[in-house]
Amino acid sequence: MATNEQFKIKLEKGKAGEYAVIQALSQITEVKDLTNYDDFKGYQQKGLDFEFLNRKTNTWDRGDAKANIMESGLTFMELYKANGKLGWFNTTKSDWIFCYSVYTKSIYYYSINEMRGYIDNRLKDRSIKTSHLKSGDIGVWLPVDKNPLIEKFA
């Protein structure tokens, strides 16, 4: 289990990621910040940190910011929580996941629906394996700079 100190560090990293992603998106499109838990509890519980105007489709898409890129450039897709319940990768209602690296200050993004299909297919054909974290969470690690579905935010 994570200690209280580890949880605080993770929370601060997450807030830094949310801020960086929302600021970067705000430079190119309209963004609705949904990160205030008290004001947007329902959105937050669905894994939504913001909505943004997708300039390609001219629709409002939902986004979730993660600050879970390791120094090695790998990002973690949480399939199951330690308690056996589905992890954020399976439960988020977001359209897009934005990953922020606290090490490089880079932002990467991917379509959650496309990535779910990709992960499902790779698990079925055994070309990737699940990892069990010390926390008890189960998921897969993917390199942000080599995966065909993950794009770097300019």
Report the location of each language-model feature.
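Generic structural signal for beta-strand residues in well-ordered domains
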Residues: 43, 55-56, 90, 100
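Non-catalytic C-terminal interaction segments of nucleic acid-processing enzymes
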Residues: 5, 9, 57, 84, ...
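A short acidic/basic microdomain associated with nuclease active sites
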Residues: 8, 22-53
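Catalytic cores of nucleic-acid endonucleases
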Residues: 4-11, 29-36, 65-108
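Intrinsically disordered, low-complexity regions of eukaryotic proteins
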Residues: 51-53, 66, 80, 139, ...
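Interdomain/boundary linker segments immediately adjacent to catalytic/signaling cores
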Residues: 1-27
